[in-house]
Amino acid sequence: MSEKIITALRQVAADTYALAGQTHICHWNVRGPSFFSLHTAFEQQYNELFVAVDEIAERIRAKGAFAPGGLGNLAQLAGLEEIAEDASAQDMVRHLVAANGKLLNDLKTARDCAGEVGDSETEDLMIARIQVHEKTVWMLNSFLE
């Protein structure tokens, strides 16, 4: 078990969990002319993220380590800025673009750590997650144009 990979995966798990929660808050609090489309899009995103964090946590367990748990521990590990509950729809989308971008950096770090030690299963999982978040960033940025 590589501690470097575990540390990177724990960061990815914490940030994925935080992003799921933030996206859920956006789903609850979005308002304005784009309400229906964003409300639906945010729901799709947080549901996908909750499935993803489970896969990431299970990968950590498969590597022989413990997945991060407890809201306090996850909050301490997560490197994402909080979103204001009363953010405008545009600000919500901008925030989620930035948060997905931060998570993309974490995913690429974890992918690279896995590649260095020949852990192709973890590398594949990180590549799949990178593809999801790149698409999400593209879609959110398209909304802002």
Q: How would you label these PLM feature ranges?
A:
Residues 1-4, 19-44, 106-121:
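Helix-loop segments that flank and shape redox-cofactor active sites
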Residues 1-12, 82, 89-92:
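Disorder-to-helix initiation segments
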Residues 11-14, 18, 44-51, 95-98, ...:
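DHp/HisKA dimerization-phosphoacceptor four-helix bundle of two-component histidine kinases
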Residues 13, 20, 27, 53, ...:
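A structural signal for well-ordered alpha-helices, especially hydrophobic packing surfaces
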Residues 24, 71-76:
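Mobile beta-alpha loop/short-helix "lid" or hinge segments that flank ligand
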Residues 34-73:
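Conserved alpha-helical segments that form or flank metal/cofactor-binding pockets of metalloenzymes
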Residues 54, 58, 75-128:
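Acidic/histidine-rich alpha-helical segments that form the ligand environment
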